[in-house]
Amino acid sequence: MVLSQRQRDELNRAIADYLRSNGYEEAYSVFKKEAELDMNEELDKKYAGLLEKKWTSVIRLQKKVMELESKLNEAKEEFTSGGPLGQKRDPKEWIPRPPEKYALSGHRSPVTRVIFHPVFSVMVSASEDATIKVWDYETGDFERTLKGHTDSVQDISFDHSGKLLASCSADMTIKLWDFQGFECIRTMHGHDHNVSSVAIMPNGDHIVSASRDKTIKMWEVQTGYCVKTFTGHREWVRMVRPNQDGTLIASCSNDQTVRVWVVATKECKAELREHEHVVECISWAPESSYSSISEATGSETKKSGKPGPFLLSGSRDKTIKMWDVSTGMCLMTLVGHDNWVRGVLFHSGGKFILSCADDKTLRVWDYKNKRCMKTLNAHEHFVTSLDFHKTAPYVVTGSVDQTVKVWECR
């Protein structure tokens, strides 16, 4: 590249200033003579430190160029492997991609839970503002608010048909809502403290709940009566989730354990105790993932010939653990989050795990290689909850920043 006469003159003066101000007197006088420079004080001021400034700005720009090049390469790779026009990925391998499709505002306090409806193109969010909101995830439209709780709504759960919605709250109640008429049809009292988790059992006849009163209770949907109480946790029970056939329930607690209970007998079948802090969340592995898990972990197929069941747990110790419930063994620990893990679940294709945490990220894990394969900076504040649609390519997240975000997978 050829410099113009003016640029050459400016460069020479900047070099002369650099030589003089750094004490290279001899080199300065030779250079000044050879470059035929007529130095005067006014001009000197203009070129003082100019060479160093140019040099540092070039380095800064080089760094920026390298960052942009790496982002461009990543985008190209994503476009060819996952973009709508590139080579088609198997839907089982679709993962959430930034940016979000929608960022939905409306809650006036942190969002505590987000879930998809099993049938319609809606999702539901619960919040510390004591409300439940319904949104259309395809259009991003707000549909309605369900009001009835008098304190933070902690968890929500649909039955398999999506006709009933259960919610639980720090107001110590569990409510059952008719999701067709959007009316509260039953309120259940019985816990002595904040009810932190609720789930409708797969058969739709019973609801299970967990509380800060250290108990897990089972309720009859038809009557609202409490029919069973499971005791054993020594601290606040954070979450409770039934397995696919409803014969087992898993729970996690501030006592740093995960427990698995036999519903019929109320017996604690397993106590899983390798976390080093409060266990915030749990999730059962779908049967579609059993073969991938067995392959990844080398776990034995039992006498029954069936592997599993398998369970995931996420903790304030910043780790995610995978457990073989039948043996009580921890099969793997995934490390990567920089803060409390608040939500964890299996990808519907069975090959990946998704998690969210107080480090404001949503992460996708390739558990076969025990590595985090994608990190999305999902929210401005802690990410409290996530859900993965069973059939449509969407993930939803909720946050302390009061927003709900919809992420498209491809």
UniProtKB/Swiss-Prot annotation:
InterPro entries: Dynein_regulator_LIS1 (IPR017252), G-protein_beta_WD-40_rep (IPR020472), LIS1_N (IPR037190), LisH (IPR006594), PAC1-like_LisH-like_dom (IPR056795), WD40/YVTN_repeat-like_dom_sf (IPR015943), WD40_repeat_CS (IPR019775), WD40_repeat_dom_sf (IPR036322)
UniProt modified residues of type N6-acetyllysine: K53
Effect noted on mutating H149R: Abrogates self-association and interaction with DAB1, dynein, NDEL1, PAFAH1B3 and RSN. Also impairs localization to centrosomes and microtubule plus ends. Reduces protein stability
Signal peptide interval: none
The keyword Cytoplasm appears for this protein: yes
One GO location term (cellular component): kinesin complex
Each WD repeat, start to end: 106-147, 148-187, 190-229, 232-271, 274-333, 336-377, 378-410
Tissue and organ distribution: Highly expressed in brain, particularly the hippocampus and the olfactory bulb. Also highly expressed in testis, including all seminiferous tubule cell types, all types of spermatogenic and Sertoli cells, and meiotically dividing and elongating spermatids. Expressed at lower levels in heart, kidney, large intestine, liver, lung, ovary, small intestine and spleen.
Consequences of knocking out this gene: Double heterozygous PAFAH1B1 and homozygous VLDLR knockout mice present no obvious cortical layering defects. Double heterozygous PAFAH1B1 and homozygous LRP8 knockout mice display a reeler-like phenotype in the forebrain consisting of the inversion of cortical layers and hippocampal disorganization.
Entry's localization field: Cytoplasm, Cytoskeleton; Cytoplasm, Cytoskeleton, Microtubule organizing center, Centrosome; Cytoplasm, Cytoskeleton, Spindle; Nucleus membrane
Region (Required for self-association and interaction with PAFAH1B2 and PAFAH1B3): 1-38
UniProt region (Interaction with dynein and dynactin), positions on chain: 83-410
Effect of S169P: Abrogates interaction with NDEL1, PAFAH1B3 and RSN. Also impairs localization to centrosomes and microtubule plus ends. Reduces protein stability
Region of interest (Interaction with NDEL1), ranges: 1-102, 388-410
Impact reported for L19R: Impairs self-association, reduces protein stability and promotes localization to actin fibers
Outcome reported for the amino acid change (mutating R238A): Abrogates interaction with PAFAH1B2
Variant or mutagenesis effect after changing I15R: Impairs self-association and reduces protein stability
Phenotype upon changing G162S: Abrogates interaction with PAFAH1B3 and RSN. Also impairs localization to centrosomes and microtubule plus ends. Reduces protein stability
Domain LisH, first and last residues per copy: 7-39
GO function terms (MF aspect): dynein complex binding; dynein intermediate chain binding; identical protein binding; microtubule binding; phosphoprotein binding; protein heterodimerization activity
Region annotated Interaction with NDE1, chain positions: 1-66
Entry text on domains: Dimerization mediated by the LisH domain may be required to activate dynein.
SUBUNIT field: Component of the cytosolic PAF-AH (I) heterotetrameric enzyme, which is composed of PAFAH1B1 (beta), PAFAH1B2 (alpha2) and PAFAH1B3 (alpha1) subunits. The catalytic activity of the enzyme resides in the alpha1 (PAFAH1B3) and alpha2 (PAFAH1B2) subunits, whereas the beta subunit (PAFAH1B1) has regulatory activity. Trimer formation is not essential for the catalytic activity.
Reported function: Regulatory subunit (beta subunit) of the cytosolic type I platelet-activating factor (PAF) acetylhydrolase (PAF-AH (I)), an enzyme that catalyzes the hydrolyze of the acetyl group at the sn-2 position of PAF and its analogs and participates in PAF inactivation. Regulates the PAF-AH (I) activity in a catalytic dimer composition-dependent manner. Positively regulates the activity of the minus-end directed microtubule motor protein dynein. May enhance dynein-mediated microtubule sliding by targeting dynein to the microtubule plus end.
Protein name: Platelet-activating factor acetylhydrolase IB subunit beta
Gene: Pafah1b1
